[in-house]
């Protein structure tokens, strides 16, 4: 509409008036009946920049009689075309992706379905029994025919029904440099309008981007109203959580006039949350958002993918990257129509385990020998009742026939099974031919038997269109499960690997905590019965061929989120983890302290030769393995091998269970630094103690771990058991000079500070490490926590005369940042990194008032005050 025609329409009252929103009924926007406007001029409530007037209220006009449902579909959504999709009717409501409309096409508010009385004067266009009791008020079409509709209350207080405006709530971006940015415009009451930028943030922007299928990450921007021309403002103070599927589902206020902050409208910039290395993907030409031709956005333009070697494993990755769960299937030969523009990729060979197509082996960008007749496509069929699959075979083309119903896969009994039934199943799965296979070829299912006495004519397009018994009614056992082998007609189909697997928090990509992606969420595996055979299957699925070792008891740290799987039982020969799961997903009796892990391509500890000893003995404070940060109190798991000088002083087993007594710091191959108070209880007899180096998980023997006897204990001569001053000691390990502990990437010495060095001025980036109190229990894995050094006056004020010049003060003073080093961490190191240099042990954990107590920082022995004494004893 040109500006002149817009102004003329404005003068003639041809534009609708924005009246208000109803916060209870999903903030649906209402306006007056466009067929029966009241006499006189009819202006919108607020147009910028020339007009500001509050909304007018008036009684709703008489309501019309409703015609028969038309055959035409509702108007197409503009942003869907922009995103490369052609909208199709949603089986229950408006076009797929817009099922949240709750206003009729003449502006009446929809009633909640549960609020509609059972007896009506006029019958709606279709049975609505399935919707009774629903608490929402979204427009629906129960029989899938005709336009969506809803009930509303008319001016006389009676309940009537009306068709809905399916474009209501559509959004688009205007005025940006590309389709991923611009001013937000919302379609309501037949007119595109904008949103006031008050309280507009990234959560609101992300909902817009998700609704437009332009990625899940949005950045909030603002645009001056002065550049937008004459346009209504609909909303202000939009308050989205960020996970809504449509802007209509967010809390917001109807625009009541006034002034927007700096007279700015809401705008967004959209991006895909996977980061710049993950290409932007969309599906085009399909009948829904769950299927279509694969198109990638690269170098400023959209292009397609060639179908050479394209299979279901590639489709799984595409569906995962798009956030679409369900069954992934690859389609070939431009099944969803030929695309335009360049062919971006060829020879894509995913394993099915990647999170993005960028991680798959493939050709270079733009290199191919294809035309658009070979454009690749995918379908990501949602797991709704009636979805079918073939399971337990060598690929997606063969196996037990399983049907999804009420959240669970079940089988089909073979009573009365015919070739026509097989034909319908294979055709629905995208294959040309098929035959019934012997049930002995595939492992028996342990789930329910959902269907029996199925009879197809061969003309059905969907398996559930065939006649059958009611769900769950049968007289069969699993020995009668239907098994099928379908023939792809020359197209190779590799095995679909089921849910993806990843390894987390290891020191390299070949080890870590095992996590699986199920139901749209990463979760862990419980270690009940976890063995090297299970680890072998995980490593094989990830593409590793060497020996595999299982790790238990959260060896790589505790995961977050759900525990998906328990009691895995692999023989070691399975193709993927999915073949080993015998228990229902999500059923377990575990905690994250039992998370399972693996090490792939495990060849044990490599022997340390003389060259290794020579190269490492001359350095200190070197961290060969460091990447991330999980907890002492307020801390986090360290990376295995990330603090190679961390050792533990342990009681020998005849004094108990060989338990950890104190932390300590390796200064050289034969000398260890710790706290003097560690020897108060059991004395300073060397027979009572051992030192463990290279340890990470206290209960799991590890390849770099070594327990060494104690040859000598040297406690500072000024230390008194009834005092905390001079709390420092040295321990000489058993062995020839400089040959006590063997250095490796996991065993290295720390550096000493300079004499009288003041770390508050020379060092930053400080950490405490140990196996101590985590706030819940003592940790099995080595913990780390960043900790700030504090001016000594904080501890002098708190501890008075107990704090001396031979001590350091460190910790967080705020209760919500509880970082402290306690109990099992006594004697352990406080390490700081010299800028651009190495790691130095500035403190030895000594004492404090409680653990992580507000206003009670930890006290550490100041190592720089004892450097001459340390060097005189150790000859370093």
UniProtKB/Swiss-Prot annotation:
Pro residues bias: start-end ranges: 57-72
SMART domains per the UniProt record, alphabetical: KR (SM00130), SR (SM00202), Tryp_SPc (SM00020)
Pfam family of the protein (one): Trypsin
Disulfide bond annotation, renumbered to this chain: 94-166, 110-150, 139-164, 196-260, 209-270, 240-250, 306-370, 319-380, 350-360, 413-476, 426-486, 456-466, 526-590, 539-600, 570-580, 620-751, 662-678, 766-832, 795-809, 822-851
UniProt-listed InterPro entries: Kringle, Kringle-like, Kringle_CS, Kringle_sf, Peptidase_S1_PA, Peptidase_S1_PA_chymotrypsin, Peptidase_S1A, SRCR
Glycosylated residue positions: 26, 684
Name by which UniProt lists this protein: Neurotrypsin
Protein's organism: Gorilla gorilla gorilla
Gene of this entry: PRSS12
């Amino acid at each position: 509409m040109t500006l002149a025609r817009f102004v003329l329409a404005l003068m003639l009252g041809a534009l609708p008036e924005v009246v208000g929103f109803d916060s209870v009924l999903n903030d649906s926007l209402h306006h007056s009946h466009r067929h029966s406007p009241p006499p006189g001029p009819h202006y919108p409530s607020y147009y910028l920049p020339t007009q500001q007037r509050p909304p007018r209220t008036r009684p709703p006009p008489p309501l019309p009689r409703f015609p028969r449902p038309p055959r035409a579909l509702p108007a197409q959504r503009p942003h869907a075309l922009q995103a490369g999709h052609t909208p199709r009717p949603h089986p229950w409501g408006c076009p797929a992706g817009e099922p949240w409309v709750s206003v009729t096409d003449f502006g009446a508010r929809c009633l909640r379905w549960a609020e509609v009385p059972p007896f009506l004067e006029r019958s709606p266009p279709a049975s609505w029994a399935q919707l009774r009791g629903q608490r929402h008020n979204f427009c629906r079409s129960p029989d899938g025919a005709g336009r969506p509709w809803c009930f509303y209350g008319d001016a006389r207080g009676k309940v009537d029904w009306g068709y809905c405006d399916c474009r209501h709530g559509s959004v688009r971006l205007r005025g940006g440099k590309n389709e991923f940015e611009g001013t937000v415009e919302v379609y309501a009451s037949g007119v595109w309008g904008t949103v006031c930028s008050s309280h507009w943030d990234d959560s609101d922007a992300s909902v817009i981007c998700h609704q437009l299928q332009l990625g899940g990450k949005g950045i909030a921007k603002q645009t001056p109203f002065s550049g937008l021309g004459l346009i209504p403002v609909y909303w202000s103070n939009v308050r989205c959580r960020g996970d809504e599927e449509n802007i209509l589902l967010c809390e917001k206020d109807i625009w009541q006039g006034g002034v927007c902050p700096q007279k700015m409208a809401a705008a967004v910039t959209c991006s895909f949350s996977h980061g710049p290395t993950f290409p932007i993907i969309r599906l085009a030409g399909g009948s829904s958002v769950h299927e279509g031709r694969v198109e990638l956005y690269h170098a400023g333009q959209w292009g397609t993918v060639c179908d050479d070697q394209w299979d279901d494993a590639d489709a799984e990755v595409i569906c995962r990257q798009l956030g679409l769960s369900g069954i992934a299937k690859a389609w070939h030969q431009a099944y969803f129509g030929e695309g335009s523009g360049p062919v971006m990729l060829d020879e894509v060979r995913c394993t099915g385990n990647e999170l993005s197509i960028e991680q798959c082996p493939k050709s270079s960008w733009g290199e191919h020998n294809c035309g658009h007749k070979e454009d690749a496509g995918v379908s990501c069929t949602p797991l709704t009742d009636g979805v079918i699959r073939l399971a337990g075979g060598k690929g997606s083309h063969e196996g037990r026939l399983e049907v999804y119903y009420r959240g669970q896969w079940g089988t089909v009994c073979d009573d009365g099974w015919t070739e026509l039934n097989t034909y319908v199943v294979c055709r629905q799965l995208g294959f040309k031919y098929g035959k019934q296979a012997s049930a002995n070829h595939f492992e028996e299912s342990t789930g329910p038997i959902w269907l029996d006495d199925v009879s197809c004519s061969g003309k059905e397009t969907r398996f559930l269109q065939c006649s059958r018994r009611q769900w769950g009614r049968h007289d069969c056992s699993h020995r009668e499960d239907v098994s099928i082998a379908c023939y792809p007609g020359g197209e190779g189909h590799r095995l679909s690997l089921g849910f993806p697997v990843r390894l987390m928090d290891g020191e390299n990509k070949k080890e870590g905590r095992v996590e699986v992606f199920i139901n749209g969420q990463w979760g862990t595996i419980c270690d009940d019965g976890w063995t090297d055979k299970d680890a072998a299957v995980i490593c094989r699925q990830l593409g590793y061929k060497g020996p595999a070792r299982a790790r238990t008891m959260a060896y790589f740290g505790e995961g977050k989120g759900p525990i998906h799987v328990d009691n895995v039982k692999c023989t070691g020969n399975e193709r993927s983890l999915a073949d080993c799961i015998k228990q229902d997903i999500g059923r377990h009796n575990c905690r994250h302290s039992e998370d399972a892990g693996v090490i792939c391509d495990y060849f044990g500890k490599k022997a340390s030769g003389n060259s290794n000893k020579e190269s490492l003995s001359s350095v200190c404070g070197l961290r060969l393995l460091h990447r991330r940060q999980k907890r002492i109190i307020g801390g986090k798991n360290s990376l295995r091998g990330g603090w190679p000088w961390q050792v533990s002083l342990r009681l020998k087993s005849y004094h108990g269970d060989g338990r950890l007594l104190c932390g300590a710091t390796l200064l050289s191959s034969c000398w260890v630094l710790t706290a003097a108070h560690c020897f108060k209880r059991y004395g300073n007899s060397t027979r009572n103690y051992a030192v463990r180096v290279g340890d990470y998980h206290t209960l799991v023997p590890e390849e770099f771990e070594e327990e060494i006897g104690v040859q000598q204990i040297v406690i500072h001569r000024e230390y008194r058991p009834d005092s905390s001053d001079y709390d420092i000691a040295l321990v000489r390990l058993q062995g020839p000079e400089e040959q006590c502990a063997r250095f490796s990437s996991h065993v290295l010495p720390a550096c000493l500070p300079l004499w009288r060095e003041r770390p508050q001025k020379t060092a930053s980036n400080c950490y405490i490490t140990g196996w101590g109190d985590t706030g819940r229990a003592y940790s099995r894995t080595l913990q780390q926590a960043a900790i700030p050094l504090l001016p000594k006056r904080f501890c002098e004020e708190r501890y008075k005369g107990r704090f001396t010049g031979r001590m350091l003060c460190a910790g967080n003073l705020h209760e919500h940042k509880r970082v402290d080093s306690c109990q099992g961490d006594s004697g352990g190191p406080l390490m700081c990194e010299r800028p651009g240099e190495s790691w130095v042990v500035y403190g030895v954990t000594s004492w404090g008032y409680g653990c992580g107590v507000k206003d009670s920082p930890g006290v550490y022995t100041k190592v720089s005050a004892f450097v001459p004494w340390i060097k005189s004893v150790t000859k370093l």
